[in-house]
């Protein structure tokens, strides 16, 4: 099974324009006989089965490791089906998608809805002579480190990884640790990596927050761990944000804010 979304409550309640697939197109992507075979394995009182009732310690460890080949093969399978979708619908899905300057020196790695905000900021900064970019994570688990390395321009010197979670007591959040490990295993020790948190509890992450991240990457002495979108006056991890930052919205855009309470929303 796949979890096919990375965002929370606020995003799920937005009104967005979407492109809906025709089911006939979807059938072409799937082996429906395999789907039926998979569904037939589900627990059903009409043909009951017992599974996972007990397993001794002498074989449990071996059993857990035996699934490794399935996880190792999965990125290539996902990549194959993404290619089919791209061919059919004209999209550009990949395990990791890069957006920005081909010769970027500063890059953000993130996933989910913050990428849309980051793209607006990238367009503005690159149009004004800077060289920045974004790596969008499409497949988080299983993580494909070699594909991440391919997506990062060779010119990159500094990376900020943004996680929408907090792991108290850990040296970094999950995506940050994956990126650091992938770069270390690939011998890319020339890249400096910092990690930040954003959007907890559906906290807004406006363009000013993304501007702040790229500004932090300019510094010689960067905060290794930081937050954006809030003012942290306790542990002082938050980055300073310019509330009068440039307007990155498309020309002619009208922005409105509606206030409601409870069921009014």
Residue ranges and their predicted role:
Residues 2-98:
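Conformationally flexible catalytic loops at phosphate/diphosphate-handling active centers
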Residues 255-264:
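Conserved phosphate/anionic-ligand binding catalytic regions in large, soluble enzymes, centered on
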Residues 77-93, 110-117, 137-145:
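A general structural motif
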Residues 103-130, 143-150:
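Redox- and metal-dependent alpha/beta enzyme cores, enriched for Fe-S-associated oxidoreductases
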Residues 83-106, 119, 239-251:
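Glycine-/acidic-rich phosphate or pyrophosphate-binding loops and their flanking alpha/beta elements
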Residues 13-20, 119-121, 145-147, 170-174, ...:
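Short acidic, glycine/serine/threonine-rich loops at helix termini
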Residues 158-248:
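Peripheral docking tails and interdomain loops at the edges
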């Amino acid at each position: 099974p796949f979890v096919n979304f990375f965002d929370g409550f606020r995003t799920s309640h937005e009104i967005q324009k979407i492109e809906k697939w025709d089911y006939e197109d979807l059938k072409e992507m799937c082996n429906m006989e395999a789907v039926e075979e998979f569904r037939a394995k589900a627990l059903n009182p009409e043909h009951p089965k017992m599974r996972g009732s007990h397993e001794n310690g002498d074989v449990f460890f071996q059993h857990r490791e035996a699934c490794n080949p399935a996880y190792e093969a999965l990125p290539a399978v996902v990549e194959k089906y993404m290619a089919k979708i791209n061919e059919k619908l004209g999209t550009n899905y990949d395990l990791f998608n890069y957006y920005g300057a081909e010769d970027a020196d500063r890059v953000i790695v993130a996933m989910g809805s913050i990428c849309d905000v980051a793209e607006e900021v990238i367009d503005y900064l690159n149009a004004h002579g800077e060289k920045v970019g974004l790596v969008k994570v499409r497949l988080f688990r299983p993580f494909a480190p070699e594909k991440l390395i391919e997506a990062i321009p060779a010119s990159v010197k500094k990376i900020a990884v943004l996680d929408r979670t907090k792991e108290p007591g850990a040296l970094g959040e999950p995506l940050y640790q994956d990126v650091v490990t992938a770069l270390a295993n690939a011998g890319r020790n020339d890249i400096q990596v910092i990690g930040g948190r954003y959007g907890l509890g559906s906290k807004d992450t406006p363009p000013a927050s993304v501007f702040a991240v790229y500004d932090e990457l300019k510094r010689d002495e960067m905060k290794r761990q930081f937050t954006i979108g809030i003012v942290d006056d306790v542990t002082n991890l938050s980055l300073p944000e310019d509330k009068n930052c440039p307007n990155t919205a498309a020309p002619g855009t009208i922005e409105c804010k509606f206030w409601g309470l409870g069921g009014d929303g």
